[in-house]
Structure formats: structure tokens, C-alpha cells
Amino acid sequence: MAHPNPASTPAPLYLTGNKDGLRDFLNKFDVFLFDCDGVLWSGDHIFPGTVETLELLRKNGKQVVFVTNNSTKSRADYCKKLQSLGIPSTVEEVFSSSYSASIYISRILDLPKDKKKVFVIGETGIEQELRAENVPFIGGTDPAYRRDIQPQDYKLIAEGDSSMLDSEVGVVLVGLDFHLNYLKLALAFHYIKRGAVFLATNIDSTLPNSGTLFPGAGSMSAPLIMMLGSEPTSLGKPSQAMMDAIEGKFRFDRSRACMVGTGKLGGTLGVLTGVSSKDDFVSGAVRPHAYLDKLSDLLESGL
């Protein structure tokens, strides 16, 4: 999708220290969707004023939703992380890419009755959310798939032998998998070639950790994209599919929802505590509507 010409896009409002501007901005929205890492915390360090800012929003009747592309954790696991950092939260306030994918498969995809099973490349977070939606699956953390491919496997896969390929698989779902191997990729490729829907929890190419970058969930999909010559439907942020799923669950007016983030992918409110600089927000190809030095600057609104 082509990005808008920066010259034709209004410069974002800088709201830090602008009490009236902050109050007017907050009053435009009923729902606040939070990117977490870089907005609420960095690593295991919560930013000062985060809890108080969330309390301010809730006190003023705003709905708070925590949005994450982390597919390795279930919503319950992610809620525990929030609470361990001192952030009050409930499972229903968490919307993860693994949950988004599970909702999409169970409630939106119209799969044939004999093709309801999902082949998973990913970790327990995906499995827990699929299980909660009563979606049958294979692969994932099953030790049977954590092995080298054997010479006889090629012929069995090519022939569609039931010992290698399950005829009931109608979806291949790819997330971050710490045990990705040739066998999993070969099976995923042949399921998709046989008509399975190609989905990804998210397409982030890298995963930040310990001050550097590691392969992300998008890097798990990359070999399949190369083989197939086609892209998966992504169920993570900032995809339209994830926004549709969030809107469907929480039943809000999208024009009254504020997405708070750190990246260069747009959103409503940007903060400078993550990966973006002021120049990115002011001169970048995709700009937020407004930005702050840090999230806790919202406390200056006096609401």
C-alpha cells in the first residue's frame, strides 16, 4: 500500500505541556488501544506515571485495551505480565495476535466441514487461544514435529500420505516458533499448496530483546512466502484484519478509538519512548495525529 505524501499530510500536534490541547484530544476518544513495549514499559521496566495515566483514563470512562503482537503468550499469560509490572488489567482487556488469529479462524473464516483443523507453526500462546475457541490443531509444540526430515518423508509428503499430511487441515497459521525446522516448513508448504488458508499471527521481521534484534514471527513466514510467491493474511497490528477483530469484540465506533504506539506505522497518538524520534513523527511517510514525549504527559490534562 502506498504511503501518503508527507508534504500533503498535516504535521502532528505536539501535546506535551499543552493542557488545553491534551484535554481536547482526550475528549475526542472513548477507547484507547495501547501498544505495550515502548509505550507502557521497556523490557521489564515500567515507565514512571504509567499506572496513574491508565487510572486517569479509566476514571474518565475511557475503555483501555492492551494490544500485542506477541503470539508466544496467551492473553492470560500476558495479563500476568501486566500485573507483575503493577498494571491493573483483566484478560478481557488484552488483545494479542494469537487471540486475533483464533477469533478470525473460528468466527470469520468459512471453512468446509472436513477442513476445520489448523497446522500451527508457533508456541503455546497460539495453542491456548485456539483451544479456547474450540479450534482443532496439530503441529505447534508437539515434539513429533521437532525432528529432522528423513529421506522417506519426501515421498510420503509428495503422495499426501496420511502419516505425514492430515486431510482435515484447512489452515496453516504461522507465528513465532523457537523450534522452526525444515520438516515444519515442508509440511506447511504442502498444506497450502493443497488449498489450506495461509495465515500469520503477525509479520514483524524482528524481535527486540536485550538491546538488540532477533528473528521475529515474520521471519518464520518468509521462507513460505518465497516458496509460494504469495503473502499470508496477517492477524497482528497494524493489519486491517486485527482492527476488524478488535472492533468486532469491543463494539466501539472506530472514529472514537485512539491507537497509542511508538512506531512509524501511523496510529493516533505517538510517544517518543520507543523506536521513533521526533523527526520520524514530524517528517515521516506515515504520521500520528499527535505525539507526546511520554505517555504520562497525559496527566497534564488536568482531567
Residue ranges and their predicted role:
Residues A2-C36, W41-K62, S71-F95, S102-L303:
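Asp-based, Mg2+/Mn2+-dependent phosphohydrolase catalytic module
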